[in-house]
Amino acid sequence: MVERFSDEARNTALNELPGWSQVAGREAITRTFTFRDFNEAFGFMARVALVAEKTDHHPEWRNVYRTVEVVLATHDAGGVTERDIRLAEAMNAIARQCGGI
């Protein structure tokens, strides 16, 4: 099992993740991605799904038209772990490739 980050470690990691923030009242991080249209948003989700399956770490997310709201936490650890930070980094990179604005 992976170890949950301390508040300090989580905050340090968040400082290196553009667009991500702490979820109020919960041990999780969040970001809303915006794309030009639904096609780009869905393409982003499809690419992230492949990474999530490969790493066996899945996001909580919601899509409405051109936006994708994401929450990441490692449930087994009860908070944010290295797995969440790695998936957030991958999502940021994929969003850039998919035209995220």
Curated annotation (Swiss-Prot):
Keywords: Lyase
Single annotated GO MF: 4-alpha-hydroxytetrahydrobiopterin dehydratase activity
Pfam families named among the record's database cross-references: Pterin_4a
A biological process from GO: tetrahydrobiopterin biosynthetic process
Protein name: Putative pterin-4-alpha-carbinolamine dehydratase
Coiled coil (UniProt feature): none
InterPro entries reported for this sequence: PCD_sf, Pterin_deHydtase
Family membership: Belongs to the pterin-4-alpha-carbinolamine dehydratase family.
Source species taxonomy: Bacteria, Pseudomonadati, Pseudomonadota, Alphaproteobacteria, Hyphomicrobiales
Enzyme Commission designation: 4.2.1.96
CDD domains membership: PCD_DCoH_subfamily_b
Catalytic activity: (4aS,6R)-4a-hydroxy-L-erythro-5,6,7,8-tetrahydrobiopterin = (6R)-L-erythro-6,7-dihydrobiopterin + H2O
